[in-house]
Amino acid sequence: MGTTVKKHEIDMLHGSIWNKLPLFALPVAATAILEQLFHASDVAIVGNFTGDARTVAVAAVGANGPIIGLIVNLFIGIALGANVVIANAIGCRDDNAVKRAVHTAIVFAVCGGAAVALLGQLIASPLLSILNVPEDVFPYALLYLRIYLLGMPVILLYNFEAAIFRSIGDTKVPLAALAVSGVLNVLLNLFFVIVLHMTVNGVAIATVAANAVSAALLYVRLTRTDKCVRVERKALRIDGASLKRILSIGLPAGVQSAVFSFANIVIQSAINTLGTVAIAASSAAFNVEILAYDVLNSFSQACTTFVGQNYGAGQIKRCKKTMQLSFLEGAIATFVSVVVLLLSARSLLAIFNSDPEVIAIGYIRLATILPAYVFCLIYEILSGYLRGFGISLAPALLTMLGVCGIRIAWVKFVFPMSMTFQTVMWVYPISLGATAVLILCAVLIYRPSKRFASLETEEEDK
């Protein structure tokens, strides 16, 4: 297969890392932000065009956020495992290993999505009951969740396909596919809600349909590329060794992401006891704050992929330099995004719900969480650095302790003493700070740049 680097791809093994990190990260951030904006369109449209049911409808979509996040983030983590395995193989110039990993990832995504879709229909109602979703919100939330889960095969397929493209340094094709499907998502939202007078069922159907389009676009592109990641239908099967390697890296990464979502489910259950307005406010604020997270996380993904390829090629010094520059550039981008979001917070919240009480409560969340993203940047970059070397279990376990443990304990022991929205929000900076310290300790203990120094090739670090 061809090894020529095309204009929309990035050569991670040679040349300046400083210039290439943002070229990789910014399209990833744009892709994630577009995903959030299209999800936000669900919230905004039901919040503005469903009449008296607007607050209940917004709360229904928001109440599902932690559940959907847990499932999707678990598989996105596994997709990141595929990204690392493919990137390592590319660095080693082993096209056969790349081919096996690519086809394994595609089949696993579809099969895993189908399993989640079927299981989800059975457990959707019990999950929402565990979350203490208010009675007036429950039927809307259940309808949205069941429809959304039916679309899991195409949702997961898109994410695995995007991971495959990113492993070769192509972050623009996934962005383009999402842009096309996202516009379709918004148009379908408007059609179903305004023209057909549907509520949460309309935006859920639109989301599934749009994801099917983006997955189809990337699949067609993969079948037509001349790169080593080309997909051939006759080769679509699971390779045991490739799957084992993908899961060994991806499953801990997925668990790490899912732990956040699980902890957020616990927090959501506490927020749900504060009433429909608090749920709607938290949902609206989340759709704003996640934009800053998408920016910093894109540099973590860039760090993982760059380190993955260079580790495979035996360029260990270049791996350490990647981590350092990811910190610097990620910090600049995160600072800018946080400042912009805080300055425009109330206006952004009003897009989702014009209720003054919702805006006031939503601002409390943003003012508490956004400044704490400095801790988020630390553990995301360092976790991405470790994963690039195939070290995935330690970050997952430490995140489970720092995030999940602290947040569950907070809701169980601290929240009952002062049952206010602000009390719930304080757990975010505390748990994020603790996790950053734990992951930093892990890097200092593992010291991968020294541990793998013997693999360093003679190629100069340019």
Residue ranges and their predicted role:
Residues 40, 118, 126, 160-164, ...:
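Alpha-helical transmembrane segments of multipass membrane proteins
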Residues 76-79, 147-166, 174-182, 203-218, ...:
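Short runs within selected transmembrane alpha-helices of multi-pass transporters and secretion channels
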Residues 1-25, 86-151, 195-251, 307-372, ...:
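Short alpha-helical transmembrane segments in multi-pass integral membrane proteins
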Residues 55-66, 141, 145, 204, ...:
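Small-residue hotspots at the loop-to-helix junctions and early N-terminal turns
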Residues 23-42, 147, 181, 210-214, ...:
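Transmembrane helical elements of multi-pass membrane transporters/channels
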Residues 58-118, 155-174, 268, 279-345, ...:
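Small-residue-rich hydrophobic transmembrane alpha-helices
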Residues 12-44, 48-52, 66-81, 85, ...:
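N-terminal transmembrane alpha-helices
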Residues 33, 37-59, 128-135, 191-198, ...:
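Helix-terminus/linker motif at the lipid-water interface of multi-pass membrane proteins
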